[in-house]
Amino acid sequence: MLTLSKPISAGQAQAYHKSEFANAKENYYTEGERVRGEWQGELATRYGLRGEVNEEQFARLSEGQHPQTGEALIRRQQAHEYINEHGETVRAMEHRAGWDATFSAPKSVSLTALVGGDNRVREAHRESVRVALDEMERYAQARIGGNAVAQTTGAWAVAKFEHDSSRPVDGYAAPQLHTHAVIFNVTETAEGKTRSLQAQELYKTQQYATAVYRSELAAHLQRLGYEVERGAHGQPEIKGYTREYLDASSPRRQQIEARLEEQGRRGAGAAQIAAHRTRDPGSGRT
C-alpha cells in the first residue's frame, strides 16, 4: 500500500533525514544496520545523483537548490506569520521540500522477509517499489503558474529509505517492511526550466501506484514459488499465515483499527488520519 504525506517543509525533511529516515534505530531486524538511502528518478540522473543518498545533497534539494552546486532552482518561500480574515495569527509554511510516499509491504510479506529471513522477498519489495515510482514519475507535472496548464515532464528526483519495523506500540516494534520515498518538489520542463511539482497530479496517481506495487509484488512472489492470495484490502498475501497470527503480529494496525471503531469511520483516508493521531510522540517517523 502507498500512503502520501502532506507537503513537508525543508526543515522537516532535513530533521526526518537525520533522526529517522537514515537512522539505524529504525531497523530492528537487521541488527541496527545503518539505513542507506538510494536515489531514483530521471531528474536525479540529470543531476548526477546515483547510488547512496548523501546528506548534503538531500539537504540542498529539500531547500530547492541544485544538489551538486547549491544553486537556487526554486524561488524559496520563507515562513512568515500573518493575520487572516478571522483575526487569527497564521504561520505560513516555508518552502515545500516535497512529499513522503511510503510503500508498506503486506504483513505476511514482512514476516517472510524479516522473521523468515528470505531476502529474496525483501528484494521483491524493493523492485516493486522501484517500478511503482517509475510509473508515478511518468505523470509528474510542473506548475507553470497563473492560468497556464500544468506541463507533464515525467521527471523527478526521489530519495528512498527502507525500514524494517513499524512504529513501536508499548515498546514493541513489529516487523514491517516499508520504504519511505521522499519526492522532492522540483522538476524540469521540456524547455529546461526548473519548476515546482504539481501536487494535484501526484495525489491522483496514488491509487494507481498502489495497484502497480501490489501487482508487481504478487508476480515476484509467485516467481519465487510462493502461493499468493488476495487479502482483505486487496493486497497480495503469502499463503500459510492465519488471520489470527497476522493480527497478533500487527499491534500498530490493531491500534489504528480501534481508533476507527471509536470514531465510527472507515476507509483508507480515515485510516491514514487515525495513524497520525495514534502515534507515540516519542517514537520515530515510520
Q: Over which residues does each language-model region extend?
A:
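Intrinsically disordered, flexible peripheral segments
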Residues: M1-T286
